[in-house]
């Protein structure tokens, strides 16, 4: 039995042999990837995972690969840029694992890190490449990897390895990294990840409006109506002319019948740009929905005077006149009703000319106008048209 035990390989001896072999490889300045494989092979055995020397050799082997690729890139030699960035991220990951072991107290409770200072100083020089990698992968539309690199960049701030650098307070690029994380998560249609770094991303003031858009979309996907609207209102208050926030606020208020709120939004937008045909038309529609037909018609006429080729102001004015006519008594106010229909007619006929494919909109209105004006030929034509649409 004793002889058998002596013949069996000793785990510690095998470990020392592979560590020694890896050191020899690294000294030769060649085959760093082989040295890395030796160390990752040792770490498959859970008994080796507390040995910081293994992690130190692993770190050195990745560092050597990183430096070799970096030198080729510097010399403008053909090299896989994505591989270089992956080596960067792996270097940080290994260093952080090593640091967690390095900071463990000894048997007397003393903490005396052996590697932290040198590794942290070295990695701080490489850290910008984590953010460069993020931007690189965004441009490649590889948003999953872009997100991972932006997180790796920001994560340094919470890692004890970099505690002495106070990254949370002095790193001015942290909001930029948070923005790219938010954007990448948005492009992956992951609402939870989109919102994860929102507070930090909002500190990148050059991209605040975009961040708020991504936040709004995330909250919409999460069906959180109150926070969705809160985000839309915040974005609109910052920039009333932004093409994202205005139409969505208007759509929401219109769908919920809150015309007063919709009017408030469009009036605020007009304060920012009083000549916008979009905002003027939106206001005419709100006024129509509120039953303020004369104001709707006046505003539609203003829009037509600005641009007589826009179809929708004609429709708003024509239907406003129609609704005014419908409020009149068909017997006691017959003459007045006919006059209103006569006013509605040119608007709706012009709308038909400008939007011939919108038959379901102008067809029923012209049907009622021609009927009440006793315009037999025109009425018959519209009547036949509507029958084909049924």
Language model segments and positions:
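Short coil turns that delineate tetratricopeptide repeat
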Residues: 46-49, 158, 205-206, 240-241, ...
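Structural register within alpha-helical repeat arrays
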Residues: 21-22, 58, 62-65, 126, ...
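Post-signal peptide N-terminal segment of secreted/secretory-pathway proteins
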Residues: 26-142
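Terminal, low-structured helical/coil segments at or just beyond the last alpha-helical repeat
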Residues: 235, 323, 338-390
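TPR alpha-solenoid repeat register
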Residues: 54, 162-166, 177, 210-212, ...
């Amino acid at each position: 039995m004793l002889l058998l035990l002596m013949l069996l390989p000793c785990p510690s001896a095998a470990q020392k042999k592979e560590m020694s072999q890896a050191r020899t490889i690294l000294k030769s300045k060649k085959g760093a990837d082989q040295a890395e494989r030796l160390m990752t092979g040792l770490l498959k055995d859970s008994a080796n995972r507390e040995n910081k020397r293994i992690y130190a050799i692993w770190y050195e082997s990745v560092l050597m690969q990183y430096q070799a690729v970096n030198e080729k890139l510097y010399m403008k030699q053909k090299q896989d840029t994505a591989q270089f960035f992956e080596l960067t991220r792996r270097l940080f990951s290994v260093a952080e694992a090593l640091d967690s072991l390095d900071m463990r107290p000894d048997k007397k409770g003393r903490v005396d890190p052996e590697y932290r200072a040198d590794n942290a100083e070295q990695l701080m020089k490489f850290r910008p490449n984590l953010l460069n990698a993020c931007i690189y992968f965004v441009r490649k539309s590889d948003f999953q990897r872009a997100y991972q690199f932006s997180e790796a960049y920001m994560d340094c701030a919470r890692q004890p390895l970099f505690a002495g650098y106070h990254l949370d307070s002095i790193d001015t690029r942290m909001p930029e990294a948070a923005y790219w994380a938010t954007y990448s998560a948005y492009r992956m249609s992951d609402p939870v990840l989109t919102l994860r770094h929102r507070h930090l991303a909002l500190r990148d003031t050059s991209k605040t409006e975009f961040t708020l858009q991504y936040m709004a979309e995330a909250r919409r996907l999460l069906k959180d109506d109150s926070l969705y609207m809160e985000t839309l209102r915040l974005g609109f208050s910052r920039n009333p002319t932004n093409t994202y926030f205005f139409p969505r606020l208007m759509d929401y208020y219109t769908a919920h019948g809150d015309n007063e709120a919709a009017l408030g939004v469009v009036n605020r937008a007009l304060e920012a740009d009083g000549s916008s045909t979009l905002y003027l038309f939106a206001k005419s529609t709100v006024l129509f929905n509120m039953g303020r037909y004369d104001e709707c018609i006046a505003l539609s006429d203003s829009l037509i005077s600005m641009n007589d080729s826009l179809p929708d102001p004609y429709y708003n004015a024509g239907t406003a006149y129609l609704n005014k006519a419908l409020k009149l008594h068909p017997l006691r106010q017959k003459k007045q009703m006919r006059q209103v229909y006569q006013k509605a007619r040119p608007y709706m006929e012009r709308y038909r000319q400008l939007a011939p494919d919108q038959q379901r909109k102008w067809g029923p209105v012209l049907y009622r106008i021609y009927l009440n004006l006793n315009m037999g030929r025109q009425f018959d034509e519209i009547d036949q048209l509507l029958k084909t649409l049924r």
